[in-house]
């Protein structure tokens, strides 16, 4: 197996991994992202976006045209109900949104690819270690196996990741 060289290898193609890939690829770095799931996967309870998340997506120039905007929060505890507006800051909008996670992930994955990141789906990747130093990743099996050396390896595998 030949060793390939990239500036950045990312383990995990969710919002954190793809956001990092978008920024790095737009800056001209060579980026490869390994996502063990399919392109545009769904995630339970992943549809809600806070104003902070919307601000981050705006910075990445991810359009939210079909999102359902929400202007506040409703908290229910027993018979008590309390409604609050989102706090307003200069950095974040004064609204949240509901956007199906499948659409969010698809938009971010597509933006990373459009920026120049190489996106690899349905392939698990694990770090290559030299003592306590990460050299890159190994991914895939058999004829699809790849060995990547990277100047920086980002682990964004989420809560269920093996890393």
What feature does the model see in each segment?
Residues 37-60:
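Conserved N-terminal glycine-rich FAD pyrophosphate-binding loop of Rossmann-like flavoproteins
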Residues 111-163:
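Predominantly flavin-linked oxidoreductase catalytic cores and closely associated redox partners
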Residues 16, 20-25, 112:
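Small-residue (primarily alanine) positions within well-ordered alpha-helices
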Residues 2-16:
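Beta1/beta-strand and adjacent pyrophosphate-binding region of the FAD-binding site
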Residues 9, 25-45:
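Glycine-rich FAD pyrophosphate-binding loop
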Residues 54-107:
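A conserved beta-strand/loop capping segment in the N-terminal third of enzymes
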Residues 3, 76, 81-83, 144-147:
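Short, mixed charged/polar active-site loops
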Residues 16, 39, 160:
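Conserved Rossmann-like nucleotide-cofactor binding loop
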